[in-house]
Amino acid sequence: MTEVLLKELSNSDIDWMLATGIREEMTAGAVLIRQGQSVNALHILLDGALTVSISQAENNPLGRAFAALEGGEMSEREITRLSSGEMVGEIPFVDAYLPSTTVRALRKSLILSIPQQQLAAKLEQDVSFAAHLYRASAILLADRLERIVTQLGHSTLVFAQPQLREILFIFAQLHDSDIDWLMNAGHVNRIPAGDILIHAGRPVEALHILLDGKITLSAFEDERNPLARAFSSLEGSDTPEREFARLSRGDMVGETPFVDVRPPSVTVKALEDSLVLSIPRWRLAAKLLHDTNFAARFYKVLTVLLADKQQAIVTRLGYGRLIYSTGQPLDKSFKYENELSSDFLAQVALAGARFDWMLKRIRGS
């Protein structure tokens, strides 16, 4: 994936990262990121190979603690491998998450580590750098998510439903002017129940925001090549698909073509009569190319949503962090996976207000 960074970053971006980052050689087997422990840097693999694994959560937290005290290692399962040009670590905009995977060197490797504090400041001050890095991150995450699903089996798509409600993040991050542009650039479509919005394996022509109703996501259960799938859907053949998620108002589909050149692996269908705002792909692509501020915010949204889907797969397979359940006493010494911060709750209110404002504008037009 070396070409992703070289293609997406500018010379000044690379110069800053080289000047700010710290180079470190890792021996085979050395741990770069440990599951459940905080990370204070973004790591770029310059040379070598890394393996990403998840701990088998067969024991309770107390059992895991004793295993650590006794020097024992819980069994782990590799979910993907990373090559030169990949990035790992907690980028500041996903700092709500503790890492759910362990990353270690597969062989002798060279790492460039950029401290989180300096990176956060750079992202805040340099919008061009932010747009470039967020886009590169989204491209790498989309590719990694596809590899994880392939490694674990396509049945794990059922676990890929995000933990974040997309409306809560999308409308909290975008500015009022961004939402205004989306409304002006898009058109509102009524989708009857049963109609297909996006065909798996075929080109996606628009970004869709669900204003009202419900839609389903389903994936092919067969292993045919994408071209065969695309033409089978054109011919109306009865190809077996499995539903793995349902989305409601405020959710977004059709965003992945902006960071992944592969055709979509899911079919999007209206479960009931639905209302969607559709922004043509060519118009959004032009906006992203010419409006750097908008691009930075848009690619930031995609990066967090992709990271959240990856997190959802790991967590819902039964690996990773603690989850608080109703009726349990809270332990302040633990950070729960589904614990909400005050900042997040404030964003919820802002997102809801912006979405309602958009609906009123659309219905009033």
Each model region followed by its residue ranges:
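Cytosolic regulatory regions built on CNB/CRP/Popeye-like sensor folds
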Residues: 1-365
